[in-house]
Amino acid sequence: MNDRKLIIAVFVVGLLFGAILGIVYSMYTGRYLQPSSPSYEIHFSPNGGCADTIVFWIGRANQSIHVLMYIFTLQNVAEALISAHDRGIEVKVVFDKSQIAGYSQYALLKSAGIELRNDTNPSGIMHNKVAIIDNRIVITGSFNWTNSAENSNNENLIVIHSVDAASRYESEFQNIWSQSQG
């Protein structure tokens, strides 16, 4: 084998070894690598697994989960947020002021020690449906975190893998958070 072929073979083996190490690292640490260009996932309901997708990404959080949610009644998503909080993840949620009673998960999250605020927009509602995870992942769409959205309504959920998009959503989250009541 000549030197050129040997160099190419060593290079290819090195690439494969690096890819395998990356996969193993991801599997064992639960950490994911940010793609170089934005990518996304699209989900639909009813019965499209939107709630499972939200729970999956909450479970992958390593640092922070910031949520702006109009209506939030899904127990499994609340439990996933509590589990993340118990793992030491910073969890903050802003609810619309009209949605903190009744079937809302507000009381459960508050009793678990999660930082909560009520939007104080005097001229309308806080109609966002957004979660920002680790400043890298944005979950958004028409999907309220409710049983109706999961099982009855025609809804959409988009998971955006983009530091730039997450930064823009995080800026809006911080703006609303700073103007909300705790």
Residue ranges with predicted function:
Residues 26-42:
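Ser/Thr/Pro/Gly-rich low-complexity linker/stalk segments immediately outside membranes or between
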Residues 44-50, 71-74:
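A general structural motif
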Residues 40-45, 66-69, 92-96, 155-159:
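Second-shell loop/turn segments in exported
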Residues 50-53, 57-64, 168-169, 173:
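DNA replication sliding-clamp ring fold and its partner-interaction surfaces
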Residues 65, 117-173:
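HKD (HxKxxxxD) catalytic microenvironment of the phospholipase D
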Residues 17-18, 56-115:
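Primarily the HKD phosphodiesterase
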Residues 1-26:
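Secretory targeting signatures
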Residues 47, 51-53, 115-121:
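N-terminal post-signal-peptidase region of extra-cytosolic proteins
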